[in-house]
Amino acid sequence: MDHQLTREESQRLMHLLKLPMEQYGNFPLMRKAFLRACKIVHPDKGGSDELSQELISLYRRLEESLPCLSTQDFIETDILQIPSYGTPEWDEWWKEFNKDFDLFCNEAFDRSDDEQEPQPDDSAPIILSPTYPARSQATPPKKKAKMDSPNDMPADLMEYLSCAILSNKTLPCFLIYTTLEKVELLYNKLSEEVLSPRFNQVDHKYGRKYVPIFIITGTKHRVSAVFNYCATYCSVSFIVVKGVIKEYPLYCHLCVEPYSVLQESIEELNSEFFDAPEDAAKNVNWVAISEYALKINCDDIYLLMGLYKEFQSPVPNCSKCENRMLTNHFKFHKEHHENAFYLQLVENQKTICQQAVDGVIATKTVDMAQMTRNEQLAARFDKLFERLEVILSAQSSYTISMFMAGIVWFENLFPGQSFKDLLLELLECMVSNIPKRRYWLFTGPVNTGKTTLAAAVLDLGGTIYISDCYLIELEVANSQIHGCVEVLAEKVKIRLPPGQGINNLDNLRDHLDGAVKVNLEKKHLNKKTQIFPPGIVTSNEYFIPFTLRVRFCKKLVFKFSKYQYLSLKKTECLGRYRILQNGCTLLLLLIYHCDLDDFAESIQGKVRAWKERVNSEISVSTYLEMRQCCLEGRYSVCTKYSNANTAQ
């Protein structure tokens, strides 16, 4: 190596490699330094072309003077000279290879008892050949001691344990199975650190060296988390951990033969720490909650949770059941009391109620897709009949006289016009749903009854209410259109701050037309395409653009009436009980003035019953008297009937 490079060249090479001269000859280190230096001095890396050529030239000259340092070359050369095993050439090569080695040992060993093979003749040397390989005298490795440990829990405990292998479910109770020596350590560690055992340590008498530990933790954990924690203290000893699904039965089973309690942190546990055996199998009835939400037509998750929470109170002393005013309570309290008690114990109350609400929305969607609009309106009338049964019960503050006062107020709203015919025409427009013939415009001065009538129609047909037509409110309202029969857009403004009502409504021309389906969005749900429902638009005396005027089939002009204003002011019960905004008022108006054949056949029985009840309590003379009082701006509820009903 020194003969290829001069002293000066060697020093120059080590300088380029940035190595001290003491490392000259340490070829592996010089090789690494060479590769590193090539990256530094290479022209493409910003180095010098002259230094790069000088480094490579010196290193190549040094490398040529060295013998082959790769063992792979020797191995490949040696392998090429050895013939294939099992051939006559290999036998000849093997004899030639071993001819200079004398492995004979003139020595005798005492024969052990377990040796079965005969000793070879001492006079002949042992020849190492493929046919007679030499016997090794090395000490064989010791076999690992076989641990006779169980792989699973005792069979009599399996019915109380979870057999899930790959599960992320968290549990509060676990059973740990390990050796008797590790039990005391684990019991103390579980008490001090991660987990807190509430009770007991039990001796398994089938071998008396394996012991289960039954623990309950403050919070829920995965089985794998408990196993990993215990495994840190059981590197040699076996450990089995399983979740407990029947806590109290397992505890009782471990307290009797063939088990015995060694130690427990709380003595003589009772069922209060667990679910009772008869209650363990009981769960919240999701179907019952879904059926309840469907019966009361509740699509608000928080309202449903609140209503169902009221069922937890005892039935005998419930004031709402005694008053019998809220049908969504007193009709279902007794039936759902027990299920409401179990609902308060679970953590996924919102999930359960959300599923029930989704079921209501799904039912509405199916009804909209399969039922005709006549059938939908008849179903709405049927629900209003149920409401009338409740609010006109014996314990209610409502009276038929109040509703008749509301009827005569509506009949005097448009002098010279039949309000019954006007209402029937409006309902016919909503039911027929003809494109560009489906929206009505209520316009007029302030405080003339536009919103009052529109709200009553809204409650009669089951509509959605849009106030002022703000853009953000329209976006929210679009998500609520699903399942609606009609729409009310109220207080549409123009040229007044903020004054964007007409502009926003003008952007909904396709919605108002009803000729094509439009996309309706709801949060967290996909877009739904449907015909936008018909409806009513209320507005003050503003200019309506032509693009909107052509989409209104009728325009009702409201005018201020002093006698209507005074009558409403003096008849306080109409405002206090919101009689005029109640759809039941318009329904009773139709029942009172229309023939039985004008109604759908499915509800004619209820119409006949209510017509008889109204005629029996309100005579024709009483009705005419109430109407005259309204025209004169006086108290319009029949005083005689009202006092008689109050005395009762």
Swiss-Prot record:
Compartments (UniProt record): Host nucleus
E.C. code: 5.6.2.4
SMART domains linked to this entry: DnaJ
Biological process terms in GO annotation: DNA replication; symbiont-mediated perturbation of host cell cycle G1/S transition checkpoint; symbiont-mediated suppression of host innate immune response; symbiont-mediated suppression of host JAK-STAT cascade via inhibition of JAK1 activity; symbiont-mediated suppression of host type I interferon-mediated signaling pathway
Note describing how the cofactor binds: DNA helicase activity requires Mg(2+).
Record-annotated J domain positions: 12-75
Post-translational modification: Phosphorylated on both serine and threonine residues. Small t antigen inhibits the dephosphorylation by the AC form of PP2A. O-Glycosylated near the C-terminal region.
Major location (coarse): host cell
Principal EC category: isomerase
UniProt motif (LXCXE motif) ranges: 103-107
Modified residues (Phosphothreonine): 139
DNA-binding region as annotated in the record: 154-272
GO CC aspect terms: host cell nucleus
Zinc finger (T-ag D1-type): 281-373
Residue positions, PTM N-acetylmethionine: 1
Ranges where the SF3 helicase domain occurs: 418-573
Keyword match Disulfide bond: no
Reaction catalysis annotation: Couples ATP hydrolysis with the unwinding of duplex DNA by translocating in the 3'-5' direction; ATP + H2O = ADP + phosphate + H(+)
Cofactors that this protein relies on: Mg(2+)
Binding site for ATP: 444-451
Domain free text: The J domain is essential for multiple viral activities, including virion assembly, viral DNA replication, transformation and transcriptional activation.
Function of the molecule: Isoform large T antigen is a key early protein essential for both driving viral replication and inducing cellular transformation. Plays a role in viral genome replication by driving entry of quiescent cells into the cell cycle and by autoregulating the synthesis of viral early mRNA. Displays highly oncogenic activities by corrupting the host cellular checkpoint mechanisms that guard cell division and the transcription, replication, and repair of DNA. Participates in the modulation of cellular gene expression preceeding viral DNA replication.
Subunit comment: Forms homohexamers in the presence of ATP. Interacts with host HDAC1. Interacts (via LXCXE domain) with host RB1; the interaction induces the aberrant dissociation of RB1-E2F1 complex thereby disrupting RB1's activity. Interacts (via LXCXE domain) with host pRB-related proteins RBL1 and RBL2. Interacts (via C-terminus) with host TOP1 and POLA1 allowing DNA replication. Interacts with host preinitiation complex components TBP, TFIIA and TFIID to regulate transcription initiation.
Protein name according to UniProt: Large T antigen
Organism the protein comes from: Murine polyomavirus (strain Kilham) (MPyV)
Lineage, opening ranks: Viruses, Monodnaviria, Shotokuvirae, Cossaviricota, Papovaviricetes
